[in-house]
């Protein structure tokens, strides 16, 4: 009898059965691992989200924004606007966007993701990044994460930027290359260095793999990292990608440190 069903009826039955199974598995999963707030771990009704109190503590970066640096502007001009800071000291990348400021709940989430191996946070953080970078994602051809120093990668066992890159790729269907950009050497901590010292510190730290150069040449690259701090790392990566022939390089992160972007001499 089942073989004689009209196609539409069979499809409807398959959709109903699939939905029922998904809901059943979700219900069973919630019994085993009840949903909690991603930040404070308080009880919630669904996974991968925040309670009201933690949500209010997130400093989302909202428009109007400087088209280059992604920092808030005092008023909306009705179109793309470049801040005085970006005009005075243009970044090497084309545009940067961050979902939040690196403080409060957002800082706790990023630290949990990076240092406590809470890789499930990629879902929530990826959703924030997708919303913040929708205009960059529309123009991107390839997603490239900021690479990690081999020694640090050995001890941490994962590159948080690569995990975020794959999450954004999963959400958008854009291709991801974790090996196109390589870390050639370790660098000194950037804290306390002037802009000139930061640039020297990062020079030669990154390179494009020869066998991946064809993925970069002539394409719009979306560079992914977790946090923009001093901006020196993403600028160094952008310079290398542009030298390899990238048509443009945009930057998308979870957060930025307030007061650190733009760079100051």
Give residue ranges: language-model regions.
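Glycine-rich phosphate/pyrophosphate-handling loop used in enzymes and phosphotransfer proteins
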Residues: 1-225, 229-265
